[in-house]
Amino acid sequence: MIDNICRGELYIADLNPYEGCVQGGIRPVLIVQNDKGNKFSTTTIVAPITSNIYTKKHIPTHFTIDYALDRKSIVLFEQIRVIDKNRILRYIGKLNSKDLKNIDNKIAISLGIEKV
């Protein structure tokens, strides 16, 4: 298990098994759980990432990343899920501080949270 996972970091994770239209397989994910939860829990909260940007209809819960990965990709905040940290395979990189602020908005949209 990888230690010291932090919010905003990108990892390769094993999202198998999966069913239907849910993103699965070995793929990049963005850690969205807060750092306290990451420190003390054996699970973390992630958003899967896809590089199939031309086959996905762009919706308000999507966030495009054009750095840190091999190719331009989309973070799918409508598919946020909890995974065991044992499913995290390797570190890829980290979002910059500007993008970290933007993902809060995408998470709020996905969960139906109104701005306070």
Residue ranges and their predicted role:
Residues 1-116:
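Conserved functional hotspots at enzyme active or ligand-binding sites that engage polyanionic ligands
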